């Protein structure tokens, strides 16, 4: 359940500290892939105009993939980098916009048909579906059937979750904390990028390893950390938009009657506990003696360190702090 009431809050705001015990590295192919990914994105026609292209150029999204997959070879770094910008482009076009839930729902059939290898009886003409088809082909080429199935299943969950977000925007609903945490694990698309960790590392997880309780637990904690960090860092960008209700800061402020600053501090404590949970479960996964499992765990850790390192320097988020009286970095 949710609520439609709103509050006004005190200013200015400060981000809480975002400590990270995990290593931070940059892939040596970063500059090359950043350039290639932007060219791929322009060719895809997912961006509407030159101004948007320039905004993406300045954001340097190749640096996000280079920080979160520092171990990847050039071809797999290109794959994950292109997938990340597909997600950003889709997010900007459908999720950060004023599109209604019904509009997003009507866009799903062609995307689902691509993911499911269905013959829709006509050529794929939607630019997002065409780019999705191309990315899926590369995942199939670089990974195995099990890896492809994992990725497309969580991608379908991500796409459907956008309808839920849009419905919240449309009805001006602030979701309950329980609903928000559950759905944020899907709306944030993190499971789609986590599903490519073993493709990028070249160490394929078995089905039993993927379903191991410890793997599920550490994946859920890592997911929470990254999306909650994003809710904090992106708050200036989102606070004046229609999507501001789909942010943990406003969810806590609404349902626990916190100030926005108190909500940010609470999120800082929540994400620190989730990191502690990851550290606690790691020894049991190391005991499995699987190189693939350890590579996956390291991949999760790089996602936490890399996403923070990227986001605190990216124009996608920092520009909003400069143009609005919103959070500053402590």
From Swiss-Prot:
Q: Where is this site: Plays a critical role for substrate recognition?
A: 92, 165
Alphabetic keyword roster: Lyase, Magnesium, Metal-binding
Residues under site feature: Plays a critical role for abstraction of the pyrophosphate group: 188
Which pathway does the database say it acts in?
Secondary metabolite biosynthesis; terpenoid biosynthesis
Name the residues that bind Mg(2+) 3: 230, 234, 238
InterPro entries on file: epi-cubol_syn, Isoprenoid_synthase_dom_sf, Terpene_cyclase-like_2
State the EC number(s).
Answer: 4.2.3.170
GO MF terms, alphabetically ordered: metal ion binding; terpene synthase activity
Report the residue ranges where the short sequence motif DDXXXE motif is annotated in this entry: 91-96
The UniProt site entry described as Plays a critical role in the stabilization of intermediate cation is assigned to 88
Asked if the Swiss-Prot or TrEMBL record annotates the protein with the keyword Translocase, the reply is: no
Q: Which GO terms describe its biological process?
A: terpenoid biosynthetic process
Q: Where does substrate bind?
A: 184, 237, 316-317
Q: Which family does it belong to?
A: Belongs to the terpene synthase family.
* Entry domain remark: The Asp-Asp-Xaa-Xaa-Xaa-Glu (DDXXXE) motif is important for the catalytic activity, presumably through binding to Mg(2+).
Q: What is this protein called?
A: 4-epi-cubebol synthase ((2E,6E)-farnesyl diphosphate cyclizing)
